[in-house]
Amino acid sequence: MEPLEHAGLGICPADAIDRAKQASNMILQKEGGQGCLWELVQILKDYNSQELPVNYFYQRLEEHENIFKKMATDRKVTDTVMEVAEDICEMFERNGQLFLCGNGGSAADAQHIATEFVSRFYKERPAMNAEALTVNTSTLTAIGNDYSYERVFARQLEAKARKGDMLIAISTSGTSKNVLEALRYARKQGIRTVMLMGDHEVPELQEICDHVVKVPSKITPRIQEAHIFIGHTIAEYVEHKLFGEKL
């Protein structure tokens, strides 16, 4: 059993460990069996260490799965997401507007989530008033040039948002300067604030956010995958609660 112990039982499928042990014992009883088994172990070890595309894909799937399992068992995450969804329902019932912002992939998420409200998710229903602050290139470049890039979202809120509206800010790190500036402005104006982020510590967020949703990961693409899942879940819930029984 020495060669098998050296390689580790991980070379066998989880449901085949007993058979692997039996087979290795049979091989070891034969003349030259230990050398044969040792060679097989080396082949398996070399194969498992190769960066094959399929192995790479499975590794990323496993990362994704582990993060979602953590979210599913973290009551702080699940409760906060549903609190955000309830706040959005109440805000729309008061004829408020939902704003979203972010940079790069988070900007794309902001636009995606806003569209789920304006167009539809599953049901035919009236459009809901949501807007991503990332789409007007003339506005973005003018504010960035005339003021600073830090103000590209806050300045738009100054023009469009009113007390009782909501802002969902998206930043995997939680430290994007223009996102934080938008949250600060919104907080001062009585606009409810939400941050979607990764597993990072940003103390200021406790002062400027009504809700902080932390995905339990520091890996940017995995965080973004979770953010769009959260956005979809919120959009589906809001649509069902406001229109599911009426239409």
Predicted ranges, named:
Residues G10, I27, L167, T193, ...:
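Short, well-ordered beta-strand core segments
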Residues E86-A161:
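Glycine-rich, small/polar surface segments that engage phosphate groups of diverse ligands
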Residues N95-G96, G164, G190-I191:
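Glycine-centered short loops/turns at secondary-structure junctions
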Residues L40-E51, A159, P221-L247:
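A charged, well-structured terminal subsegment
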Residues M1-A7, G174, N178-E181:
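Acidic, divalent-metal-coordinating active-site segment for phosphoryl/phosphodiester hydrolysis
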Residues L196-K214:
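Glycine-rich, charge-decorated loop segments at or immediately adjacent to ligand/cofactor-binding or catalytic sites
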Residues M1-L52:
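Mg2+-dependent phosphoryl-transfer enzymes with acidic/Ser/Thr/Gly-rich catalytic loops
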Residues L52-K76:
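Generic N-terminal amphipathic, Lys/Arg-enriched alpha-helix
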